[in-house]
Amino acid sequence: MNIESKIKEFTDQLNQFAYEYYTLDEPSVEDSEYDRLYHELVKLEQENPQLVRADSPTHWTGGVILDGFVKFRHPYNLYSLGDVFSREELALWEERVRKEIVNPEYICELKIDGLSLSLYYENGLLVTAATRGDGTTGENITENVKRIKDVPLKLKEAIDIVVRGEAYLPRQNFAKLNAERELAGAAPFANPRNAAAGTLRQLDTKIVAKRGLATFLYQEASPATNDTQEEVLEYFEELGFQVNPERKFARNLDEIWEFIEEATRLRDELPYDIDGVVIKVNNLAEQEELGFTVKAPRWAIAYKFPAEQAETEILSVDWTVGRTGVVTPTANMTPVLLAQTTVARATLHNVDYIQEKDIRNHDKVMIYKAGDIIPKVGKVLLEKRKPAKHLRKTHRANKYVWTRFGRRSVEKGLVFSKREDNRVKIPTQCPECDSDLIHFEDEVALRCVNPLCPAQIREKLIHFASRDAMNIVGLGPSVISQLFDKKLVTDVADLYQLTVEDLLTLDKVKETLAQKIVSAIAQSRENSAEKLLFGLGIRHVGGKAAKLLLERFANLRALSQASEEEISEIPSLGGVIATAVVSYFETAGAKTLLDELENAGLNFAYLGAVNVEGILSGKTVVLTGKLTTLKRKEAKEKLEALGANVSGSVSKKTDLVVAGEEAGSKLTKAQDLGIEIWSEQDLLDL
């Protein structure tokens, strides 16, 4: 391929990737692959400037506007950032800055992996919020942004200002959202960034409010009245904006690199995703002096973390059944080290995912961790796929191969039909109960609809006992599986008939654990009814929906007799949930189960929110480091019970930091700011 053809191919590919990323929010390649192609194109264009195309992505910032949203023309150009991937490349950028500026100073900020947006305020009131789009024209998403709780609708000062920032979905909210989507049979989002982008493009503002987006603001797009970037960020905090406290003042490359190394270590601790560090010249007058290229400011650069991937082989695919009947494929792989953990299994999501990527048994694949948490298959290495050796199926051929190779014929991949036997076999029957699987038109999932499917019953029991439902401590998946296999428990009502003697028949269950479980089961009878409702596992009814339903009807019995119209009147709940609830309680099985649970002494009443005026009432508290006695969620719940507002980052507004072992930058920053420090034991002593 000649140079001109290669430039054309790279340009077309990158423009398509940019469209998928910026406009559709459905990227088909990893950032690292895009960056590799982009830098190859830059190199080719530098060597052959006469061949640069007018639509080259090196001249613009990508994206077009979907017809479904009103276009918004930005009064200021919203530039993207240039990026570097090594200390050497960063040093070259810093050297260029020093050629223009004497003794420059820098501000280093975390690069949030979210969706860029701009907020327009007039006389202190939010009038417009828009996506960045292509840098000149974006989408008006004002009503959706108003549903983000940390975006101030009115500033502390009555000023006109345009600010830029990033909308993101915290990891905890992302996990909750995907869990809800899985229960509803919807495809999970690939990562928090895609989820944030998809949320801001929702036409139903109630969905936006429910998902819990957050923001960090980082730049004034309108002419700034401050002298430095550091002052801009402090001013933003005074106005009421959320500003990321994880930032550092630096005077040279070494200090910049120290922050990058700290950010790399901090990455897994953060409650949100980051994909790098942004370095900016601190002085705004010097920023103006340095100016811009066609695409990016010369006074700022983004250092991007390398995407960690690993190559492995898919050995086989298992199909498992969840409590709602969704049948999910999981790849068994040759164990490989990825992001400091050994990975041997990865989700394949659904049939569509397998077929779109053409995933087959014994394929070599690249895997990565979505959000650095969930192992996923990213790319099939087709060039390493071993083709099957097809032989004409004859008796003579069979006899020859068996005589010549014996059992090794299997190892050599010799097959005697046109069927490609490495393709993943899509099940037509449930792997647990052999019932026919259903593929509904509005779903991507295969589903077992047999209410007596053992796997579904087992998973429903596990869900019922889980922390967010009835919170029966000690009654985990292993114990429940044994109880189910021994037929000691066949539905959730049976749990309340268990005795210590029953539990002692199980493997690895001793007297102490058995007593603990029986006590926890008894205690769960007194839970507020929304916990019980969530534990029943009604499709589309998550924890928040369960609470809203019980707030309205006050009692589980009353809810079980409600109509779809009555339920649909509840704000934030729609017809889908109303239909699901009514349909569930109309079944004979549900009516019988309610009677059994009531006879077992379970509370059916909504007990209401517990308002605790504790010693930490109104205080902002940050947890950091490794806790040895409490789980992090337990510590958070205890702090909230004492009246505290638990935050994920240290700032001037922080009142207290609870520091466990190996506490890092948050503890250091708290000490620098003179914030009170507690140990885990101090918290336990309360």
Swiss-Prot record:
Catalytic residue positions: K111 (n6-amp-lysine intermediate)
Q: Where is the signal peptide?
A: none
Domain BRCT residue range list: 611-686
Q: Which residues form a coiled coil?
A: none
Q: Which SUPFAM superfamilies match?
A: BRCT domain, DNA ligase/mRNA capping enzyme, catalytic domain, Nucleic acid-binding proteins, RuvA domain 2-like
Q: Which GO terms describe its molecular function?
A: DNA ligase (NAD+) activity; metal ion binding
The organism's place on the tree of life at top rank: Bacteria
Residues reported in the UniProt entry to bind NAD(+): D31, S32, E33, Y34, D35, S80, L81, E109, R132, E166, K280, K304
CDD domains with a match to the protein in the record: BRCT_DNA_ligase_like, LIGANc
The record, for Pfam families, names: BRCT, DNA_ligase_aden, DNA_ligase_OB, DNA_ligase_ZBD, HHH_2, HHH_5, Nlig-Ia
Q: Any idea which positions bind Zn(2+)?
A: C430, C433, C448, C453
Q: Mind telling me which PANTHER family this protein's record contains?
A: CHROMOSOME TRANSMISSION FIDELITY FACTOR 18, DNA LIGASE
Protein name (Swiss-Prot/TrEMBL) = DNA ligase
Q: Which organism is it from?
A: Lactococcus lactis subsp. cremoris (strain SK11)
Q: What is the lineage of its organism?
A: Bacteria, Bacillati, Bacillota, Bacilli, Lactobacillales
